[in-house]
Amino acid sequence: MLKIAICDDEQPIREYLKRLVEKCTEGEIRLFADGGELLADPTAFDLILLDISLNREQNAAEPDGMETARKIRERSDALIIFVTALREYVFEGYDVGAFHYLLKPIDEQKFTEVMDRAICQIRSKKNVEPLVIKVGGNYVRIPVDDILYAENQARKIMLHTKSKKEP
């Protein structure tokens, strides 16, 4: 089941986005009014729909959407789709690794197309079989996306992963 976060300072927009997401897929959908709430949630989200202009007038201490995306990117590879009225941040959005950038008012057909592509990418990543290697007399399963690179050392292959090396 997909874990999806929707973060927008306007409650009607959050509810509208939730309805659109529910038309596209099933999953656990969590709603957030600001970036601070989203960042405080320990859930490992697969997909995050994020407004850039989160209302900082009410609480200037809260991060805007771009700052929130940067902090998310430090700890997660969740797909981020910006949903905003601000055209001027489109290139900066891709600098933080956004999957897509949708402009308000939302074109429902475009939203569905982007969601379909995002869901396919998430599911294909989740369905990758781990690499099984023999280490000594034991078999070890290594997630493919955890492998950084392989190195040949005296007729042995050394896999360097995000967590450790495997001979």
Language model regions located:
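Residues immediately C-terminal
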Residues: 12, 55, 149
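Two-component/phosphorelay signaling modules centered on CheY-like receiver
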Residues: 10-32
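Non-catalytic signal-transmission and effector/linker regions of two-component phosphorelay proteins
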Residues: 1-5
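Short alpha-helical segment
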Residues: 35-39
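Short loop/edge segments at beta-strand edges and connector loops
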Residues: 33-34, 103
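Conserved SAM-binding loop
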Residues: 6, 31, 82-83
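Conserved binding/recognition cores within well-folded domains
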Residues: 116-167
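CheY-like receiver
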Residues: 27, 40, 45-126
